[in-house]
């Protein structure tokens, strides 16, 4: 149940020692969250950004609102943009907002931060390099992709890089 899950999460957050085990737990949580966000965006966006005329505007905006709600971002979006719901703003928010825990940029940065804390100070791991490059792309070149209509191919690229990071993480830390 939801209550049982929240009790477990609370126990972990308030009692677990902040050692390597906790860092790996947070790394896995962050990696799963950013991966899930990208998969949902990649699945939903083709229908939302189609070139077909928007005949039923209430339905059109309801779909964008549902996307935000499904990613637990509607309230955060409204704090930034108010009631205005523009697709370009939603995309920029979900992909590139540095303060929103469910945005792709925030998620990639969180994964990178956890990897950096796990890695030794003198040795940057292969997974950290992969995710670091992805985080930099999300920070510095992402907005142009929306304007150029390359968002779906960029999401495919993000999924590929997250997969590479996962494989490298497994190889480096778990020997598989």
Residue ranges of model-derived segments:
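Alpha-helical transmembrane segments and their helix-helix packing motifs
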Residues: 1-176
């Amino acid at each position: 149940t939801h209550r049982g899950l929240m009790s477990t999460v609370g126990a972990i957050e308030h009692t677990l020692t902040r050692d390597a085990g906790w860092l790996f737990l947070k790394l896995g949580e962050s990696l799963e969250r950013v991966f899930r966000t990208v998969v949902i965006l990649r699945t939903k966006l083709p229908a939302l950004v189609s070139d077909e005329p928007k005949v039923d505007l209430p339905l059109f905006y309801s779909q964008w609102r549902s996307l935000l709600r499904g990613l637990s971002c509607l309230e955060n979006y409204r704090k930034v943009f108010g009631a205005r719901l523009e697709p370009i703003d939603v995309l920029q928010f979900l992909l590139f907002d540095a303060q929103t825990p469910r945005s792709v940029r925030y998620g990639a940065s969180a994964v990178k931060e956890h990897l950096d804390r796990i890695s030794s100070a003198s040795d940057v791991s292969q997974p950290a390099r992969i995710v670091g490059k992805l985080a930099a792309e999300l920070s510095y070149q992402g907005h142009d992709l929306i304007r150029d209509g390359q968002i779906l191919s960029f999401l495919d690229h993000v999924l590929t890089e997250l997969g590479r990071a996962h494989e490298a993480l497994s190889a480096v830390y778990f020997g598989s």
